[in-house]
Amino acid sequence: DGFQFNMSCGYNLEGIKDKKIDDFIEGMKDARDTEIFRECRTWLLEHVDLFEHVTREDIEAIPSEICNSITLSTMHGCPPQEIENIVMYLLREKHINTYVKCNPTLLGYEFVRKAMDDLGYDYMAFTDFHFKDDLQYEDAVPMLRRLKEVAAQEGLSFGVKLTNTFPVDIKRQELPGEEMYMSGKALFPLSITVAARLAESFDGELPMSF
């Protein structure tokens, strides 16, 4: 009651259609024919005497429908059309409730740079590259509207997950490489601002996951 499993998938349509991933999605939607579900159910039934508050009837009543929702994790730079194609596939072909993880770059370089500076994170180094390469806000809103309509037609739920991490430059050898991903406290004001803007654009009618 009130507990929801959620799958995560990415990063391109070709990969999601791969048999291994497809089997995983279908197995989570209904696990009754999967080896692991049968194995676990059999073990529980054979060891019901180990439980104080679980009966054989409780075990037999465990549903095989494990998960009916999925979140699309989009890499930075994922083309808008690829995002839309994947969600269309998940809604129409897989018939599963779908959420899209959005990037904080939707806010634009100038806003994010000023926000980081004003909040004491001026040491965060980044250029406008990802802001130009990622999905733009003016493209995101109409795309999300289309996907929301398709979900309604399919009798499914559609929304956004906020937000993905934010790529910043490695300047002090914090990690190997050239780029790392910002999360935690510094990301929160960006995520909540994306939420506020989308809520305004959709009159509060766009489901959001955090």
What are these regions (language model features)?
Residues 69-80, 132-136, 207-210:
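Active-site mouth loops of central-metabolism enzymes
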Residues 78-95, 99-112, 133-137:
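Extended, H/D-rich, highly charged conserved domains that either
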Residues 108-206:
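Glycine/Thr-rich beta-alpha phosphate-binding loop at enzyme active sites
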Residues 46-67, 113-115:
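A short mid-domain helix/strand-loop element embedded in enzyme catalytic domains
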Residues 50-58, 83-91, 147-151, 191-199:
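Structured alpha-helical segments in the cores of large, soluble enzyme domains
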Residues 56-82, 92:
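Active-site periphery "cap/insert" segments of enzyme catalytic domains
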Residues 1, 29, 45-52, 70-72, ...:
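Catalytic cores of nucleic-acid editing and processing enzymes
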Residues 2-37, 67-72, 97-101, 155-161, ...:
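Structural preference for beta-strand elements that scaffold enzyme active sites
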